[in-house]
Structures are given as structure tokens and as C-alpha cells.
Amino acid sequence: MKKILIGVIGVLIQLAVSGAVYGKVLNVYSPDGTVKVSIELKDKIYYSVFTGDDILLDRCTMGMTLSDGTLGVKPVLRKVRKGTVNESRKREIPLKNETVRNHYNYLRMNMAGDYTVEFRVFDDGVAYRFITDRKTPIEVVGEDFNINFPTDYRACLGEAHAFSTSYESVYTCMQTESYRKDDIMAYLPALLETPGGCKILISEADLTDYPCMFLKSTGNNGMYALFPKCPVRFEDDNDYKFKILEEASYIARTSGKRSFPWRFFVIAKNEKVLVENEMVYKLSAPCELADYSWVKPGKSSWEWWNPRIYDVDFRVGANTQTYKYYIDFAAELGLEYTLMDGAWMAAASDPWTPHPEIDLPEVIRYAKEHNVKILLWLSWLTVEKHFDQLFAKYAEWGVAGLKIDFMERSDQWMVNFYERVAKEAAKHKLVID
């Protein structure tokens, strides 16, 4: 009887807690008070984004579907934590800014089911992510990233006809109410503009061991996310890439104890604020290397981009003299690099043998003499097939870095390839173009 009574009390307490939480609204503001996120816990996790009294995103939903259930459906809130972070981060490699101010208010919702949802609200944007705390690996089948617009927005989108894309299409602008469900999807970033002129940039950050996100129209003045599935069987297609023969049912198989990529919205009154934003840097994990002094950003001459040379006293083409000419050009104009595209190789699949008319050691020596660094082009498939030896050998040759090409994918495998390349290149102090 005592055990039954305790059990009944436990159920009543759980029902009381669930009843108190269902429909609960949690608000978090930016440090300057101009941006607000309103989160509502009902059958799903809903959120809306405001600037002042204006609603920018209306009752959007978020969730993550795993092979054994969905996070964010019928959420049970266990604990809420709010706080403020105000720090300055010195960039390892200064680009727009040497020091970045990272100032935001956060809200962390610890949920039943071993996961947490974290929101960060900045003066110039909003971000959220999922964090899981499971002991065994998990399979992510998909995400519920579903955003709704309160009125007709202007959208500028990089169109992708398939998940295999070079991310090089010209952005197309349209009205969101005209963006139909059967229209092609878009890759990130995507830019929206409200009738009042407010800009909203959609993108992601801290992407590791996970595929890139794409967007598609809901058909009802909104967008939702799609992701490429993880390839499990493939074969060579040509010297540049392979053909995927079979995909998994999931988009990622990954650690069960991790944080997932940030989904963020930069909010800007004008293009100036949009260009100045450092959201990706602020949301990304700290850099792992202690010494970046060898990384030298710079400009490059590149024969593929401008291959026509006239009025010279030598035969123009894939030969030593032509590349020396490009090095002279770079040195004269203060360009830090010369990029040798695919013509430097005897064959695209052979990273060791230069074109017979190119004396590569002489080109590298000549470039060094003129204070210009050499970058070599390679296809990603050639890099992958020679991964263990390639970086060390190129560093030994005196090459400054690599331009790796034709990935044209952003599934989990390929995202991990990007990270493997960056780590191995850094180990040998090679830059990646």
C-alpha cells in the first residue's frame, strides 16, 4: 500500500510539473534589449524572434529526429538556466577585426531525454543549438528547422539543384510568398529582407562531424531544412570525384555526448552591420593550435583565372617560363602567392609528377627568391588517395599550401574530410586555399 501511494504521488507530481510547463513561455533578450526570443513549450518547441515590437520570425519549430526518437516533441523541461557572457576574443588570424567582442544573454533548457537546448541572443542576432548527453553513439535522421515569416519577405538564395553542388551559383532574389514548395532548394547562407528593410542572414556555425544544412520552401511563406544523407558505398567516377552508390538512412552517425551545429540569424538594419558581423567566429569552438604565426593571408596570381599572356618573348603555356612570369607579376604587385592550377601536373591523379615542361623545384626556388609563395592545385580525390604522404612531402618540397578542388559535397563524410585536411595541413604548416 505504501509503495502504491508513493507511486501515485510520483505520478501526480510529474503531471503537476508537466502541466505547469506545457504552454510555458520563456523570454530572453539581447544585452541592449532590442532583440527578443520568445520560446513556448507545447507539443513542440516553438520560438519567435522580435526586434522591438516587430516580429521577424513567427512560431518557428525546432527538433532533432534520432533513430530511436525525436528531441523537441512533447518536451519536458527539467531545468532552466539564464546568464550573460561578455568577453573579448583575440582572433588568431585578424581579418575584419583583431579583437571580437562576444556579448550575449543565454537560455539553457535541460530536457527529459538527456538533451539540452541553448539559445544565445546578441545585439545583432540569435542562435540556438541542441546538446545531447548520451553514453553511446546516436544516428541523426533529420532536423526540424522550420521557420515562418509573418509577411512577404524578399529572399536572396544560392540555388542548389542537388546536394552535390559547387556553391558557385549566382544568388537569385524572390519574394518568399512566391517561393513554391516544388522550387529548388538553397544552400547557406540565405539572406532575407523585411518590408521595413531589416536584413536577416540565415546560416550555421561550429559544424563538425555533421552535414551542411540546405533550405527549401514550405509552400506557406516559410522554409524548412534538408540534409544530405551519409554515403556508405561509393566508387571512383573520374580523377576528380567518386560516385555515391548507396546512402544510409541517417544524415549523421556521431557521438551521443556532444553539441550540434548552431543555427543562427544575423539581424541587421543595413548592409554595413551585415558585413561587420562576426557571428560565425563568436559561435565556433576555440582554435586548437597554439601557434598560427606561420599562417599568412594574402592575394595570389592564378593562371586559370587569367590565362592569356601576350607580347612576351617565350612560348606561353604549361612550362617553367610561364610560371616565372606569373611570379614576376605577383612580386611586382606585392601579391603574396602564385597559384599553380591543374596544368602543373602530368596527370590529375598523380600528385608527385609535374608536367614534363615544368621544372617545379626551379619554380619554387625562383618564387622564394622573389618573396612569393607557391600554392599547388589538387583534386580532393587525389588528396584522399595519397593522404598519409602528401602533406609531409609537399612541405619538404617548399610549397606553401594547397588549393583542393571539386569536393562538391557537404555530407558528414565530406565535412569530416575538410577537418582532416585542415588538421593535417596545419601539422605541416601548409595553408589551404
Segments (PLM) and residue ranges:
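Short, flexible loop/turn elements at secondary-structure junctions
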Residues: 113, 123, 151, 268, ...
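Intrinsically disordered, low-complexity acidic regions
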Residues: 244-246, 281, 324, 345-346, ...
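An acidic-aromatic substrate-binding cleft motif
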Residues: 255-329, 333
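Aromatic- and carboxylate-enriched substrate-binding clefts and catalytic-loop regions
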Residues: 341-433
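Short amphipathic alpha-helical segments and helix-helix/interface helices
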Residues: 189-191, 327, 364, 421-422
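Short loop/turn motifs at secondary-structure junctions
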Residues: 333-334, 398
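N-terminal accessory beta-strand-rich subdomains and adjacent acidic, glycine-rich linkers
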Residues: 25-282
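Bacterial Sec-dependent N-terminal signal peptides
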Residues: 1-25
